[in-house]
Amino acid sequence: MLYFRNDYQVSCIPEINEAFSSLNNQIYEPYGTDSITEHAKEILKSKMKDHDVDIQFVYGGTIANITMIRSLLASYEGIIACKTGHIVMHETGSIEATGHKIIVVDDCDGKVTADAVQKVVNQHQISFDHMVFPKAVYISNATELGTIYSEDELHALHDKCKELGLYLILDGERLGAALMSGVGYTLNDIAACCDMFTIGGTKNGALFGTAIVITNPDLRDKFRYVMKQSGALMAKSWLIALQFIALFENDAFYKNAKKANEFALQIQNSLHNLGYPLLVKGYTNQVFPALTLKQYDFLKEYVSFEIWDKRDDYIIVRFVTSFSTTQEEVNELSEYLKQAAKLG
């Protein structure tokens, strides 16, 4: 069986295993006050040298989103997100469970636009205090569809948020894939476009872990209180920080993502050449082909993948590559795709 189901099905890169083996029962201060965490923060800050940022480490993406959004919103405030957003579709109502409404807008290939944000604010102005007050915007990069924001799109969205008095947060669980897709911007540029954003490790070679980067100084003071209240403050926080050192010290973070993107592009090209329709044209490590029922029934016997959407006469599935994907696996998948294509 080939595994293209997700990008977190293998434990971690060798550098992280080596880092853990070097701990040797040493003693570290708890809750992110240790020397390893400070070192990890300094490494990440060096990637955003034009900005004064605060960094906190949590164990995963959903808890990062919960913590960031809870820290931003009053009880009567909500957050804008597109209909395909991770907090809308794949976090089991975790934001709503905190008492905050997600104001859902249509997406443009998985992306929120400045115009969509303006429309929400215009609609709110009709009823004022009879509606949830829009206070923040949530985006992800790469998006749930594997698409990416251009730097111009990020700046346009950030400028619109500033104009309207909204916070902008970016979910970066697949930020490595976005940065290595050829967009031409860096972590330093991302820091200029958001009030908060995350750098995901779990989907790019770490065992687990997410870095929350707070760029807006007004949002830092009580953030760790919200972390603790949300169950996000780990006693052994250095276990996350150590992984980010291993990811960034010698650029494994970028190498992992580049490799995954390149393999996904090979798969996408094979699909295109074989005549499979694609949901979107992707540039990252996720590929979304449409399969007939016969093609789906054949492929599922040999390949592990996710069903993304079911239509009347075809099924949209998702193939995901990762740091652990091999050329042999990609070649074998291409052979199965050739066989399935003949089934029509």
Segment roles from a protein language model:
Residues 3-6, 55-59, 81-82, 139, ...:
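General beta-strand structural signal in soluble alpha/beta enzymes
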Residues 4, 112-172:
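Active-site phosphate-binding strand-loop segment of PLP-dependent enzymes
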Residues 13-61, 83-88, 94:
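Conserved N-terminal alpha-helix of the aminotransferase class I/II PLP-enzyme fold
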Residues 63, 73-133:
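PLP-dependent aminotransferase-like
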Residues 74-76, 265-267, 271-342:
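Conserved C-terminal alpha-helix-loop-beta "cap" of PLP-dependent enzymes
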Residues 134, 143, 148, 186-284:
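Active-site C-terminal subdomain of aminotransferase-like
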Residues 150-159, 163, 174-196:
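Active-site pre-lysine segment of PLP-dependent enzymes
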